């Protein structure tokens, strides 16, 4: 039988129609000491007793969501629905991962960013500010998505690519390599931006590929 690393305390809150309980560590593990208070979960299904995974501060995990491995949910972050956060992934700020979304590896989600639908964020990717990743979108490797950028449908952002500002990547579009898409630019259909290319301003990339050192606005 696995050793329990935390317990549900009697301190509870009502959130989204559910009762969540603050957790308290029963043992020392990682940087957590026995007796440390954590964040809030609905039940023990939400946080594994194995590994160093932890929910701290006023973070909340509920529904069928699962946090495991060495993942950390901090500040006022939320994980809900059937979402999973694992590996060494971390959620900060007021970020939210919900529905069937998965965040894993060494990925970070912070600020007021949202990852939902069946989206995946993994590798060393970072999603922050007010960025939204949803649908079946993927953000991975060392990619960063921030500002008010939206990535959705079957779009992918990876490599060392950056998507920010009010940029919008959707349909089956891809942004990768060292590419940058920003301002109000939109990449969609089967379009792609790669290598050291930059797409910005009010540019619309519809089913074509921008590569090398090209700049389009």
Question: Which residues fall in each region the model found?
Answer:
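Terminal amphipathic alpha-helical/low-complexity segments used for targeting or macromolecular assembly
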Residues: 1-50, 212, 217
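A detector of tandem-repeat and repeat-rich interaction/domain scaffolds
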Residues: 51-209
């Amino acid at each position: 039988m696995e050793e329990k690393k935390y317990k549900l305390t009697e301190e509870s809150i009502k959130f989204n129609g559910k009762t969540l309980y603050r957790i308290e560590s029963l043992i020392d593990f990682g940087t957590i000491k026995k007796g440390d208070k954590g964040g809030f979960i609905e039940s023990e299904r939400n946080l594994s007793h194995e590994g160093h995974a932890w929910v701290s501060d006023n973070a909340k995990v509920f529904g069928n969501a699962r946090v495991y491995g060495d993942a950390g949910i901090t500040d006022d972050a939320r994980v809900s629905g059937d979402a999973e956060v694992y590996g060494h992934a971390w959620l900060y700020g007021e970020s939210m991962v919900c529905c069937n979304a998965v965040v894993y590896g060494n990925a970070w989600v912070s600020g007021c960013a949202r990852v939902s639908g069946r989206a995946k964020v993994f590798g060393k990717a970072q999603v922050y500010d007010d960025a939204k990743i949803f649908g079946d979108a993927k953000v991975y490797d060392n990619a960063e998505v921030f500002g008010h950028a939206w990535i959705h449908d079957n779009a992918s952002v990876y490599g060392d690519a950056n998507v920010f500002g009010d940029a919008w990547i959707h349909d089956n579009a891809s942004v990768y390599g060292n590419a940058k898409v920003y301002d109000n630019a939109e990449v969609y259909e089967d379009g792609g931006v790669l290598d050291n290319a930059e797409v910005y301003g009010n540019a619309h990339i519809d089913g074509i590929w921008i590569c090398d050192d090209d700049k389009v606005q």
